[in-house]
Amino acid sequence: MAAPTETESSDGTAAAPTQEQQSDSYKLRFCTVCASNQNRSMEAHLRLSTAPSPFPVISFGTGSLVRLPGPSITQPNVYNFNTTSYSQMYEELYSKDERLYRNNGLLNMLERNRNLKWGPERFQDWVPGMPRVDHVAKGDKGALGTEGGVVDVIITCEERCWDAVVDDLMNKGSLLNRPVHVFNVDIKDNHEEALVGGKAILELANRLNEAAVQERKANNSEGWENGTGEARRSFDEKVPEILAAWQEKWPNLPALWTLAWL
């Protein structure tokens, strides 16, 4: 009789994964943020959720309204967060002036976005710890792993968005008492720079996750989710070094970092 494999118990059923296997497959959960949850945060959402080894990811905007360019600088297209889908925006702009919005890239951007998730969400309306199982049911890319409504890393794409996120987290009162690393990667708000920024954010995510996996292997993952334990403490201490090494490779994307609490 053949001996059971590493993934099979003696009775032929699937064996529970070992701690080492769990560490190898561990993924940090990410949140990407820009002003309108349209261009920069969604390009990063795409990169993270469709990477060869994808990450759990959610995304938001920090503006009061979703603003997209219109026929002139004084005539933007304005929408509400949380209630207007990317598909609705696409259909409206298509019917208004297909040629204009095709040429300026908005229709292509909205096509990408509606294949990632339902619609733009506002960061200030997010309640950390509130379940997001409906986003899994909707088929949002990156939703698996974010059902619990918590993330480990928030990456904003503009300094004013970083300020808004940090202020909002303080105002929410850290009810979960759970640490979260908040980065800003400064990306100009155009399609070309968003592509570059998305690639850079994915590299930062990979570096952070590699360090997290190493620490969980070396020091046990006990207490990790609560921000306690040797593995978590060691990882948190290494984050500034990881960012500094990343910044050397991406000097044109100035970055900020702070440790905050959900």
Swiss-Prot record:
It is found in: Nucleus. This is RNA polymerase II subunit A C-terminal domain phosphatase ssu72. Component of the cleavage and polyadenylation factor (CPF) complex. Its EC number is 3.1.3.16. It comes from the Eukaryota. It catalyses: O-phospho-L-seryl-[protein] + H2O = L-seryl-[protein] + phosphate; O-phospho-L-threonyl-[protein] + H2O = L-threonyl-[protein] + phosphate. Pfam families: Ssu72. It comes from Aspergillus oryzae (strain ATCC 42149 / RIB 40) (Yellow koji mold). Belongs to the SSU72 phosphatase family. The lineage of its organism: Eukaryota, Fungi, Dikarya, Ascomycota, Pezizomycotina. Gene3D superfamilies: 3.40.50.2300.
